[in-house]
A protein has these predicted regions:
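Membrane transport/envelope proteins' first extracytoplasmic loop
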Residues: 2, 6, 11-19, 23-278, ...
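Hydrophobic alpha-helical bundles that form the membrane domains of multi-pass transporters
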Residues: 3-8, 12-29, 37, 163, ...
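Alpha-helical transmembrane segments, especially those used as permease/efflux helices
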Residues: 11-18, 264-267, 363, 367-380, ...
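Alpha-helical transmembrane segments
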Residues: 27-58, 289, 338-347, 423-425, ...
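Small-residue-rich transmembrane alpha-helices
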Residues: 288, 322-352, 364-389, 418-433, ...
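Membrane-water interface of transmembrane alpha-helices in multipass transporters/channels
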Residues: 355-363, 428-447, 520, 727-731, ...
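Juxtamembrane segments of multi-pass membrane proteins
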Residues: 449, 454-455, 461-609, 614-617, ...
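C-terminal transmembrane helical bundles of large multi-pass transporters
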Residues: 496, 500, 567, 677-827, ...
Length: 852
């Protein structure tokens, strides 16, 4: 039977290859994902290892609670006098202090250098070629007072040379510094699109407004002193606001901030690999079902000469195993190219990822191969069991077909039950309280899987009415070819449904994503119109997300025509045992914002004073707060104060710029080291005019890292990140569409084989080659339209269910995009039919009539 299985594969090379493509693409996605994320992980580890390689211990500011690196809060700085104390310890060989922050480089055109949303990293360098310096000098020399070294990527892209001056802006106005050298970060070729700027310590302290302060002290031990001994000795001289870790511990903590991102990215991309394999399973099952139906007499003959049902099953599963192994190996090879493509994809949309070379681990190989082989075998089980039911007498019968299963009558109620259970599981994941993230994702994935399987099975009952409706134009305009095409799609409803289901899944997910994006955009526009109805302009960072120095708003306030500047500061705080993103506003914010108050009014924003706060309704309910209630809030540097509630507001559907607790900016500045604005909003006399815009632009000419935006520009720039994410999702989902495309091609090729005599008879009674091509093309388009219609409808239902759970998105139906998806489904059908239609048209009439 092994020989029979291998001959079966070799005798159907084209059909096997088309079926294998589905597995190749899915395995490539799984392997490429692991290679991408393992490469990123390796790059980050290289970065953190290079940073700490010359150190045995690291001293840093101590926070009262763990803070997020991207939440606007920082650890308290160290006094520079601590460095001398550390150097004086007997166990210390050397120690160097450093400061760091966001340092915006300015191009030759006077505009900020921004690569997508990547940060602009700036830091002091420990005496050039010191053991504590993680940078490698590519060209030039290390910086002295008034110098800067910048990364080679920026030099190459922006055409800078050593000796030229470049603008650098940190906490104050931009400064002109001489480029003394070009550097790279250790062994990493790119650190994710970020720009690097290195300075000597005095220059960095001036730029970051940290005179007399340090962010870190790197310490090296004398020979014979262990890391733990060194840490113990250092701890004795530290103030309460400082902490010390071994270099290995610090590197591990630094890496922990990226581990969450890498885990999320891996899960995110693997989901699309799983989708591609899931769609591929439909292609495999459908292809094998068709080929097994075509081989009915072959299997019957084998049964006649003594083959048992078990041997038939074994033969087919061996075919599936060989195909799965070969396709998975090819997919693994394609995964290398796909991982490079994923790097390029993220780079193209502004999310450049760190890279130190591709990494292929044994785990990635095993998981990718196992996934491909397992999916192939599971998808082959049902067709294989069907083949075992072929009776020996079928060998002598013309046109023998496979007998129906004893359980065929359960197909309809089973599919309805499966779909219903899927919606129950999905609803449970969305609406059940207290679910962990893992439980939520498991229930959501299980629910989606059951829904797709259930609807795919139900589609068999929907094919006839849908083909009648969607095939009407073909029947009316396509003549006999169109009528035959519609009838052919209705002839074997199970086959048509299975083929359409592959496209349905991809389009359902595309529709779901588009629906969510449309809802987010629509809701965000509504929030801006409702909350910031009085603002004429917004001031933000060039990358739209980073905080901006307070000096930017101060400069804008001095521009002619400015009536008010409302600021929003942001960072982390802790109260009632929970850490949250807190905010602060200045009195002018009362003229900018219009909130929906449960208790209080917009005037509260100007009356907060030293101990006032307003809170959102959810926070108030969680902690039983009302007007006058106390909130004891702790800040990252350990300072704390008690605030009294002066107002309670209801956040709009699309979210709010304010955190659970908002206090006055002056009070905020007392409790936070180096505060910054998240946004600033400007009211100008005369509103939006060219003169007012020019006045603001002129006022901010010394702050290139900030930009002036109108209301619509602000909205467009804030949602630009969403557009980038959406583009990534579309590209990744296109993989499942591509799998379904090959599924349609494969089905059409197989049906052409199956209907060879039929096509020969049609040609014999006068059908032209052109009409044959048209018939196959119409059949492909009708099948694609069925998949498209079911997919779009299912995507709308799933999207509506998800939006009903998410309280910050309004349901919005993106009609234009849905029409585009419907047209795309038709296009897929047209393109998929090209090869099978030509193959059918080229059949020799006499040979076709004699075909068995």
């Amino acid at each position: 039977m092994i020989r029979v299985a291998l001959k079966g594969i070799l005798g159907r090379k084209l059909r096997t290859s088309l079926t294998a493509i589905a597995i190749i693409l899915g395995v490539a996605m799984v392997a490429g994902t692991f290679m991408l994320t393992d490469s990123i992980d390796n790059a980050f580890n290289s970065i953190f290892t290079d940073v700490r390689k010359g150190s045995n211990a690291v001293i840093s500011g101590k926070t009262a609670f763990d803070i997020s690196s991207d939440a606007g809060s920082t650890a308290p700085p160290l006094n520079e006098s601590l460095l001398a104390k550390v150097r004086g310890l007997s166990d210390v060989e050397a120690a160097e202090g450093s400061v760091n922050g966001q340092a915006q480089l300015i191009g030759k055109n006077g505009k900020a250098i921004v690569f997508g949303g990547a940060p602009n990293l700036g830091f002091s360098i420990a005496n050039g070629a010191s053991r504590f310096n993680p940078l490698s000098l590519v060209k030039g020399e290390w910086p002295k007072q008034g110098d800067v070294v910048i990364d080679q990527s920026t030099v190459k892209k922006k055409h800078f040379e050593i000796g030229q001056t470049i603008g650098v802006q940190a906490q104050g106005a931009a400064q002109r510094l001489r480029i003394s050298g070009i550097v790279r970060f250790g062994s990493v070729s790119t650190i994710g699109g970020a720009t690097l700027a290195g300075f000597d310590l005095p220059t960095a302290q001036k730029l970051f407004d940290k005179r007399g302060k340090l962010d870190e002290i790197a310490v090296a031990a004398k020979p014979g002193v262990s890391d733990n001994q060194l840490v113990s000795a250092i701890r004795d001289v530290l103030p309460p606001t400082a902490q010390v870790r071994t270099a290995a511990q610090q590197a591990k903590k630094d890496a922990a901030d990226t581990n969450g991102f890498i885990s999320f990215l891996r899960g995110f991309l693997l989901a699309f690999g799983g989708i591609a394999l899931f769609v591929g399973s439909f292609v495999i099952a459908n292809s094998l079902s068709i080929t097994i139906a075509q081989r009915t007499r072959e299997f019957a003959t084998l049964r006649t000469v003594g083959a048992s049902r078990r041997q038939i099953l074994t033969s087919i599963m061996i075919e599936a195993l060989v195909m799965g192994v070969l396709a998975s190996l090819v997919g693994l090879a394609f995964g290398v190219a796909l991982s490079k493509g994923l790097f390029a994809l993220f780079d193209a949309v502004g999310f450049t990822l760190p890279n130190s070379g591709l990494v292929l681990t044994g785990t990635a190989v095993v998981i990718a191969l196992a996934a491909g082989i397992l999916v192939t075998l599971v998808a082959s089980l049902r067709p294989a069991f069907r083949a075992t039911r072929v009776p020996p007498l079928a060998a002598v019968r013309e046109g023998a077909t496979l007998p129906k299963s004893r359980f065929a009558f359960l197909r309809l109620p089973g599919s309805i039950l499966l779909t219903a259970l899927g919606f129950v599981a999905l609803s449970y994941s969305l609406f059940a309280p207290g679910l962990s993230t893992t439980s939520l994702l498991v229930w959501m994935g299980l629910g989606a899987l059951m829904i797709f399987l259930g609807v795919a099975l139900l589609a068999e009952r929907l094919v006839r009415p849908l083909a009648t409706l969607l095939g009407w134009p073909a029947a009316k305009l396509g003549g006999t070819a169109g009528v035959l095409a519609r009838e052919n799609t209705q002839r074997n409803t199970q086959r048509t449904a299975s083929t359409a289901a592959a496209l349905m899944i991809g389009l359902a997910l595309v529709t779901l994503v588009t629906l969510l994006a449309a809802g987010i955009v629509s809701t965000f526009r509504g929030v801006v119109d409702d909350l910031w109805k009085n603002a004429d302009y917004a001031l933000t960072a060039q990358n739209n997300f980073s905080p901006i120095p307070i000096s930017v708003a101060d400069a804008a306030a001095k521009a002619p025509g400015v009536d008010a500047v409302g600021n929003v500061r942001a960072g982390q705080a802790k109260a009632f045992g929970s850490v949250y993103n807190a905010t602060a506003v200045n009195p002018d914010a009362a003229r900018i914002f219009s909130l929906n108050w449960k208790d209080g009014s917009d005037a509260v924003l100007a009356q907060l004073g030293e101990d006032g706060a307003f809170v959102d309704d959810g926070f108030a309910k969680d902690h039983n707060l009302k007007i006058g209630s106390p909130i004891h809030q702790t800040f990252p540097n350990g300072k704390s104060a008690t605030f009294r509630v002066m107002g309670i507001f209801k956040p709009p559907t699309g979210g709010s710029p304010f955190g659970p607790v908002t206090i006055s900016d002056k009070t905020w500045d007392r409790f936070n080291d180096q505060p910054q604005n998240l946004y600033s909003f400007v009211i100008m006399k005369g509103g939006e005019t060219d003169a007012n815009r020019a006045a603001l632009d002129h006022a901010l000419k010394e702050f290139p890292n900030a930009k002036v935006q109108t209301r619509n520009e602000f909205i467009d720039n804030q949602i630009s990140g969403l557009s980038s994410v959406l583009n990534i999702l579309y590209v990744l989902l296109a993989l499942s569409i591509l799998v379904s495309f090959f599924g349609i091609v494969n089905t059409l090729v197989l049906t052409v084989f199956e209907r060879t005599r039929e096509i020969g008879m049609l040609r014999a009674v006068g059908m032209t080659r052109r009409q044959v091509r048209r018939m196959i093309r119409h059949e492909s388009v009708i099948t694609s339209m069925i998949g498209g219609a079911l997919g779009i409808l299912l995507g709308i239902v799933l999207g509506g269910l998800l939006i009903a759970r998410v309280d910050f998105i309004d349901f919005t139906l993106p009609i234009v995009q849905l029409v585009v998806f419907a047209v795309a489904a038709i296009f897929v059908g047209i393109v998929a039919a090209i090869f099978p239609a030509r193959r059918a048209a080229r059949l020799n009439v006499l040979q076709a009539l004699q075909y068995e």
